[in-house]
Amino acid sequence: MKLVLASKNAKKLDELRRFLAGTPVEVVLPPDDLPDVIEDRPTFRENAAKKAISAARHTGMLALADDSGLEVDHLKGEPGVRSARWAGAHGDDEANNRMLLQKLRGVPLHKRGARFVCALAVARPDGTLALEVSGSARGRILNERCGTRDFGYDPYFLFTEEGYEETGRGFAELTPEEKLRVSHRGRALRELARKLPGIA
């Protein structure tokens, strides 16, 4: 089975290939003319589905897309689907983290619950959805940076789910392997790898 990734991000492709190694699934990058999709849906699931359907129709192949972000309890789920562009420019991690800390100023740690969410969708060339999976990881938002692996909101996210070696550590403190064991993306990818062979 061959899947086209609804993203030109080579890092995402490498990550997927690692997860799907040993399965009969091959993931490839999309053609250069893959149209950009406006992520204007209210949920991660709907945005992932929209991107997967667009890529599947454009390429005539099964297509895989993802959408992910941070939901903070005290902020009623913000930044949510706007996580990457919350402070304005898409992908400005520093500005997004500044806004996060500003909005949580004065809020005690025990009221800073949050979760990362990742939604994955696979669509068929006719525009129907073949598979949807998701994963999440609970934690708290810290006042100070924790760890050196800067990516998105990771430097301020403390993983708090009980029963893991990684419990009580910041996402930015974890190695890539440790993070994939407990992260929203790792959990969604494991579910994808488990279910994907069944849609052939």
For each predicted feature, which ranges?
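Anionic-ligand binding patches
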Residues: 1-4, 11-200
